[in-house]
Amino acid sequence: MAHLGEFSLADGSVEHLQDEKGPMLYRVTSLAHDPQSRTLFYTSDNYAYRDVMAFDLDTGKERQLLKEARIGELVVNPADQSLWGVRHLNGIVTLVRIPPPYTEWNQIHSLPYGELLYDLDISPDGKLLSASFGQVDGNQSLRVFEIDALLAGEFESIRGFDFGAAVPEGFVFSPDGKYLYGSSFYTGVSNIFRYEIADGDIQAVSNAETGFFRPLPLGDDQLIVFEFTGDGFVPAKLDAQPLEDLSSITFLGQQLVEEHPQIKDWQVGSPAEVDLESKIKREGDYV
């Protein structure tokens, strides 16, 4: 049963908090935590019109904030406790802001048809918003915006990094607001990368064999990551130290071709080269 849970860093136990109605396939829900009010914000009915919900960590009570809002990718702005998210309707993606008491949403900016916006995060001081973008041609990028400029109607990023076809996933701010940590399949396997906001420098901080995902910065260059294993995703701690050299994974097909070059000639020919007349066995009326 899909549910919200609290994971203990001390012993690895998970406390069941709330069942999730209509979970997403891989991520269960879009989840945001407000430590000031000790509230979890999340989405339900994710394969319908998506409701925005709140769960009080002190009382254990759930309440519905917005019904059928079509809003996900939630994140809390620690400066004013507003919720930010992404709304999907008729192929149009819209960045929205939901101020307390979370009864209505305000449009910030709508992207052109076909462009995507996902994996939002807001800096600890509430001044910057980061997001991943997907273009119609398949190019993916990470961008950083000033929130004051967004509220003034200006949708121009101050920083960004183009990942090409390698999707940037789960990028989040470090506690000091200097870096963004996230994952990408840049080397053929999902590694964790650190993006420095001041100068736009990006560096790998992991060299995974099976893949690391969804980093959570703890401070002092410590991260919690999810490692992909045969038993599913397993939480692990990682020292986020920049690496100079990364090993690319070896694809079995590529290895076979290098060892046996004749495989390159094992290709199915074009149907246009087939002599169809020679294949006829009998002609007549079809009954």
Show where each model-derived region lies.
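A flexible loop/linker signature enriched in serine peptidases of the S9 family
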Residues: M1-G5, D19-R27, Q36, F41-M53, ...
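Short loop/turn segments that connect beta-strands within beta-propeller blades
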Residues: S8-G12, D56-G60, P99-T103, I147-L151, ...
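A short beta-strand motif characteristic of beta-propeller blades
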Residues: S13-K21, G60-L66, E104-S110, E156-D162, ...
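Residue-level detector of Asp-centered blade-edge/turn motifs that repeat once per structural unit
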Residues: P35-Q36, P78-A79, P124-D125, P175-D176, ...
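Outer-membrane beta-barrel initiation region
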Residues: S184, D239-V287
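C-terminal, active-site-flanking charged/polar segments
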Residues: N191, D199-E258
